[in-house]
UniProtKB/Swiss-Prot annotation:
UniProt cross-references to NCBIfam families, sorted A to Z: rpsS_bact
Gene3D superfamilies linked: 30s Ribosomal Protein S19, Chain A
Protein name as annotated: Small ribosomal subunit protein uS19c
Record-linked SUPFAM superfamilies: Ribosomal protein S19
Stored InterPro entries: Ribosomal_uS19, Ribosomal_uS19_bac-type, Ribosomal_uS19_CS, Ribosomal_uS19_SF
Natural source organism: Phaseolus vulgaris (Kidney bean)
Amino acid sequence: MTRSLKKNPFVANHLLRKINKLNTKAEKDIILTWSRASTIIPTMIGHTIAIHNGKEHLPIYITDRMVGHKLGEFSPTLNFRGHAKNDNRSRR
């Protein structure tokens, strides 16, 4: 289900504070965050945000096409290694 348009998009307060601080200083530091549920808003464009995937932080450069999506969409948590090899020799 999508979020109601009457409500504002969810952005974690600490993340919003960090972005506003960097915007006033006009700096482009990497921002570490664990908040995968935060929505990307236009003030984040141009920043690099390192999003936690459960193991490490993946740096993602925010572009204008990402606005409206969640941060967690851009850092995959699972890596598929492939199906088990069908080894007929082990069956005999």
